Amino acid sequence: MKIKVKLFEGGKMPQINEKGDLFDVFARTKVILNAPQAGVQHQVNLEKVRDVVFSNKLIPIGFAMEIPAGFKANLLPRSSTYKKWGIIFGNHVGQIDSSYCGDNDEWMVNAIALR
């Protein structure tokens, strides 16, 4: 099966890790995410509790791919993603189907910083 891949400026081709069967993808640009502040006090009377606001950003991963009809791709974090980068995926699993295949349909990761 052949799959068309379009690289965007600064993007890298998905790479198969020599120890596994999955593709690794890489951020195309530097993205700064602000993590919520630690030290929120929780008391029974709730007077000193404040909301913790999490921000998310879409991180471009540098390519578009033409998925064949009837197939889909899943973007999943590696088990080391949080340890290395302090982020989680906002939607936990990014699912991309064959309809997302236009020239400007760059794949992105919805990321939330926790630290």
Which residues fall in each region the model found?
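DUTPase catalytic domain/fold
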Residues: 1-115
